[in-house]
A protein has these predicted regions:
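Acidic, S/T/G-rich, low-cysteine, solvent-exposed domains in lumenal/extracellular/periplasmic regions
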Residues: 59, 76-336
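Hydrophobic targeting/anchoring helices
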Residues: 1-90
Length: 336
């Protein structure tokens, strides 16, 4: 059941060993839709839930989100020691509650024609065709959301390190006035990091988990969290893990709206060793820098953008799926 539908067994209570499955689905032979079980099990609530599920079978009633995320590493490569890719199945599940979600690597250089929004998470080494797909979607007036950073995190027996990465989007973002700086933001306003610590007592040693101050887990909240945007509605705070600061200098006709910022006491660090640090008393040993300031972590850009590929031959000219339209300016919204 878990492999085919992704459903987990349930229990009546934490202390009940009996397990059961209680899910409701709709299936037309091609598409399986999970219908949320309403909290109040009334006929009216069930009817409403089923009607919402049926909307997914009618074209035009739900907006379509194209999600570009790293392809999962094959089991064979994992056995050969290849590092696992980031998994965004939970994000896909949340989006699927309200949108029609399509997973697309954009390798053919085009965004699906029915897309209303493109979300790019954790991009790594995007090629020219993939960037072209995003660029042309933006030129058509589409909305592009990019979640990226200057570093990838590698965990090994020797520690936790931030490794520089190339998303493939750096020149395209810079063309639109957004640069992801090669640094990490550290903030005294942060979420804790659980670290096992060995203590000695009465001739015995025992290990316990200690929640350490960890400035790389930035706790973003007002006034650093914009309260009046649809994307932040209902959010009181958000934790950003090992984020890089943004420098934003778009064209004059572009409207800039800061979405996420660190606190006034945050600072930048070029250190790539991001292991938690503990002093002799078992406390966090991070020392704030002298130069502290609020750092921009997320922005929204809106206006008329110029194509990154303007006055260039289409990268799809040698492709059987050639897009014969020339890159043009367009009106669009974009977030990075």
């Amino acid at each position: 059941i878990n492999a085919q539908y992704g459903f987990q067994p349930m229990a009546a209570s934490l202390f009940d060993d009996s397990r059961f499955y209680f899910y409701l689905t709709l299936n037309d032979g091609q598409t399986l839709v999970q219908v949320p079980i309403p909290e109040a099990l009334s006929a009216e609530n069930f009817q409403r839930a089923i009607e919402e599920g049926l909307k997914r079978y009618a074209s035009g009633l739900l907006k379509t989100v194209v999600l570009h995320a790293p392809a999962p590493v094959s089991p064979y490569l994992s056995q050969q020691g290849a590092p696992p890719s980031q998994q965004f199945t939970q994000l896909q599940g949340f989006l699927s509650d309200d949108f029609e979600v399509t997973i697309d690597q954009l390798e053919n250089g085009q965004v699906p024609a029915n897309a209303d929004l493109v979300i790019v998470v954790d991009p790594d080494g995007l090629d020219e065709r993939q960037v072209f797909a995003l660029d042309q979607f933006l030129m058509r007036g589409g909305t592009v959301v990019v979640s990226s950073g200057a570093f990838a995190v590698q965990t090994s027996q020797s520690g936790i390190n931030a490794v520089p990465r190339n998303s493939g989007l750096e020149p395209w973002l810079a063309h639109h006035g957004v640069s992801i700086e090669s640094a990490l933001v550290m903030d005294p306003q942060n979420a804790a990091f659980p670290v096992p610590v060995t203590r000695q007592a009465g001739g015995f040693s025992f290990q316990e988990l200690v929640m350490l101050d960890y400035p790389y887990f930035i706790d973003v909240r007002a006034p650093g969290l914009h309260p009046e945007l649809p994307i932040t509605t209902g959010l009181s705070q958000i934790t950003m893990s090992r984020a890089s600061p943004l420098t934003v200098q778009p064209a004059e006709n572009i409207l800039i709206t800061p979405i996420l910022s660190s606190s006034l006491n945050s600072w930048r660090s070029s250190q790539t060793n991001v292991m938690p640090r503990i002093d002799e008393q078992g406390l966090s040993a991070f020392v704030p820098a002298d130069d502290t300031a609020r750092q921009t972590l997320g922005v929204a850009l809106q206006g008329r953008f110029e194509s990154y590929f303007a006055n260039q031959a289409s990268v799809l000219l040698n492709s059987p799926t050639t897009n014969k339209s020339d890159p043009q300016d367009g009106n669009a919204n974009s977030s990075a």
